[in-house]
Amino acid sequence: MKNLLALIICSISLLSNLKAQTYPSLNINLLAHLNPETDNTGNDNRKYSGCWGWYQAAKNKEYAIVATSSKTYFIDVTNPAAPIICDSVKALKNGCTWREVKNYQNYCYIVSDDNPPNSFQIVDMQYLPDSVHVVHSGTTYFERSHTIFVDHNRLYCGAPKDVVTGYESPMRVYSLANPENPVLLRRLEDDISNTQIDYVHDMFVRNDTIFASTGWKGLQILKFDTLTNHFSLIQTYDGYPYDGYNHSSWQTDNRKTMVFADEVPASLPAKVIDVSDLNNIMIVDTINSHALATPHNPYIVGNNWCWISTYQDGIYLYDISNPSNTTVHGYFDTHPQHGVNDNFSTSAYRGNWGAYPYLPSKIIIACDMQNGIFILEGDVNYTNPVSVKENVKQPSTFSVYPNPASNEINFLIANQFHKTITCVITDMLGKVVLENSFIINDDFYKTVININSLKNGCYFVTLKGTNSNETKKIIIQH
C-alpha cells in the first residue's frame, strides 16, 4: 500500500508541469504527460523507447506499457488525464537504447538489443493495478532481440542473440501455448539461407504471412506454415523508389494496403504500397511530415488511419482511406526543441520512437526518447468517424500510370470532364511545373505527357474540366 501511494504521489508530481511546455499540434489533444525516467539514460540522453498497451477486460482498465533505458513501466490510463504508475520492472542492464514490449493475454514480453549483460523478461500483469509479477528474467531462450511481434499464440523475435555463443538468428518463432514457458518452433535460417535473409529488423505478422523488414535487403514476405512449422519465401520487394534501410511496417485490416518506413539514410519518406496481390506489389503513394523528416514506426488502425512516429517531428496521423492520395489529418509534436516542423533540420535520430493506438478508448500512447510519455486523443473525426454510407468516395474519373513514373505518364480519362480539360502538375510546395490542355470526344480518352524535365520527387496531377476537378499524387523516379 505504501508503494502504491508513493507511485500515485510520483505520478501527480510528474504531471504538475503539464502546462509548462507548449507542443504544436493539429487535431490531436494532449491529455497527460509523464517523465518518470530520470536515471541511467542511454546515448544522446535517450530515456524512452518502445511502448505498448493492454486492456484488462476483467477490471475494465486500460494500461500503457512503456520501455525505458533501465526498466519497464506499467501505467493505469483508464482515466487518461490522470494516469497512475502502478509498477515497474527493472532491467538487468541500465542505460539501454533499444527496448521493445508486446503482450499476449495478460503476459508482457520485454526484449532489449543493447550489449551484454542483457535478458529476456516475461511479466504477468493479471494483478494490476496493484502490481506485476516477473515470471522469467534471464537468457534461457536468448539474451538479446531487436524487436518482437505477437500474432495469435506465437512470438516472433527479430535478430535474437544467444548468450554463450553470441550467435544471432535472423528470426525465430516461439509458441506461447504456455505463456510463461515459450517453446521454440523454428529458426528462419532452418528454411531460408542467410544469403537471402541474414537479418530481420522488425516484422508485421497476420496469420501465416510475415512481412519482414530486413534492412538493406528490403521487405521480404514469408509464409510460416503453422501445421509443419516451416518458413517459405513468398516475395521479395526491394529496389523501390527512395529505398533505404527497410525498418518496419503495418498492414490495413482488409490486407490491401501496407505502410513501411526506411530509416536510413535520414529523410526518406514512408511508402504506401498495394499488397492486395503479393505477386504485384506497387507503391501507390509516399508520405512524410516534411521533406527532411524521418519516419520511424507506422501503426495502422482499421483501413483508414495510419499513425507514424516521426522522430523529431513527433507523431503524425494520416488519412489513408484513399491509399493513392493520403493526407495529413493531424500531428502532435512531442519534440518541440528540434525537428523540421520547428525550423530546425537535423539528421539526428531523436524524438518520437513509437506509439500504441489500439486501446478501446482510442487514446494514443506515444513515447519521445528524450521528452517522456504522452497520452493523446484524436479529434472527433478520428474517434467517431462518419458512417460508411456517409463516407463513400465518388468513383475516380481518370487514372494515371505508371506510378512511380520515369520518362512519361499515361492518362486514361473518362468523359465526365467534357470536351476541354486542363492538366496541371504541381510540386509539393504548390508550384506549377507543367501544364497541358486536351480536347476529348470519346467516352474514354488516352494521352501521354513527357516528364523528363521534372526532377525526382512527389507531384500532384490535377485534371480540370467544365464540371469536374480531380487530383492524384504521382512519384517521379528517373
Predicted features and spans:
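Sec-dependent N-terminal signal peptides
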Residues: 4-13
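Feature marking well-ordered beta-strand scaffolds used for ligand recognition
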Residues: 20-385
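C-terminal outer-membrane/trafficking sorting elements
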Residues: 391-401, 405-478
